[in-house]
Amino acid sequence: ALSLVPSDLGALLHSVEKDFSSHPSSGNNQLVLTIQPDLPEISADSERLIQVITNLISNAERHTQNGTITISLTGEPGWQTICVSDTGTGMSEEMRKNALKGYVSADKDYWRHGIGLYVCHQIITAHGGKIWLKSKEGEGTQVFFSLPEEES
């Protein structure tokens, strides 16, 4: 079950970014954070969202070398959207179609490396949110998730 409390997603992202910045990535990547100012707090389980964001950044780092990983937070009426974008290897169409279903990986050691996109999907949908991705082989991946500003 989720433990929902008023949460500032911008502060949460700064906290996660600080953790990653203090441990240089093996891929020599630059981490960039872009946060839209003055967004309201939302009702969320911060621990679970940190788990999702950490997993998405770890995935991006694992598939990106000497590139850029961008984390952005934007708001639109009723929703806040976080995007973790990388300049890495990207995914094939088949991998992209199955990525949120919980049984596909570009990396045979995948399950040793975090919770997986399927669990991210479960956490976001439990918040009344939605998660989706865009990816092209050789051009990187963008994973988005949107959370409602009011409980659904």
Where are these regions (language model features)?
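Short helix-loop "hinge" at the ATP-lid/N-box region of the Bergerat-fold HATPase_c
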Residues: A60-E61
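Short alpha-helical Gxxx[C/S/T] motif in the catalytic ATP-binding
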Residues: G116, C120
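A conserved beta-strand-to-alpha-helix junction within the catalytic ATP-binding
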Residues: S3-K18
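Short beta-strand/loop element within the Bergerat-fold HATPase_c
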Residues: T68-G78
